A protein has these predicted regions:
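OB-fold and OB-like single-stranded nucleic-acid-recognition modules
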Residues: 20-173
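Positively charged n-region of N-terminal signal peptides that target proteins for export
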Residues: 1-4
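Repetitive helical segments and hydrophobic/amphipathic motifs
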Residues: 11-12
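C-terminal motif of bacterial Sec signal peptides marking the signal peptidase cleavage site
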Residues: 15-19
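Segments that form or flank anion-binding pockets
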Residues: 8
Length: 173
């Protein structure tokens, strides 16, 4: 019995070390996407330089000064990445030398998007705070400015996803 308990403790320690950053690779799946991205917000240093793979849709973000950022994102529950109290997007600003497919149905609340599979790294733990105009329903509210926070993602591989029927547009815990 004691030997079984020791083996269980060793196994649990190995699992905990893997979950706490001992991995050199993070494959974000439908089940782990939200948890890993949330953890990354609090402990980005453990992900810097590590290989990360994930599926997302393309999203063009424009700040209040007109600068555009191409992002790979998913939609998620309120509270992640902004203080707006509304549902928001979760993902990265994509740094890629190749062509990133153009967003599709960006302003519509639908899963009919331009989906891509990405592999790359988080080059630094520095967050970009981007000031954007708020949305009021389906319209932009130019009187209200919100701040969203993103990390950069150095893309080493980008593959368009033709059939995204198995992917959730909206991710949650």
């Amino acid at each position: 019995m004691k030997k079984c308990l020791v083996l269980c403790m060793i196994f649990l320690t190995a699992v905990c070390l893997s979950a706490c950053g001992a991995s050199d690779r993070y494959d974000l799946t439908e089940e782990t996407f939200f948890l890993v991205m949330t953890n990354m917000q609090y402990y980005p240093e453990q992900y810097v330089g590590k290989t990360v793979t994930y599926d997302s849709f393309t999203y063009r973000l424009t700040d209040v000064e007109g600068k555009e950022y191409m992002c790979g994102v998913r939609k998620c529950s309120s509270g992640y990445g902004c203080n707006c109290g509304k549902d928001t997007i979760i993902g990265f600003i994509l740094d890629y030398d190749g062509v990133i497919p153009e967003p599709k149905n960006q302003s519509e609340d639908t899963s009919d998007k331009t989906w891509i599979h990405l592999e790359g790294t988080l080059p630094s733990a520095k967050k970009d705070e981007i000031k954007i105009y708020a949305y009021n329903g389906d319209e932009i509210d130019y009187d209200t400015v919100e701040t969203v926070v993103f990390y950069h993602f150095a893309v080493s591989s980008l593959t368009p996803i033709e059939d995204a029927s198995g992917l959730a547009y909206y991710v949650s815990k």
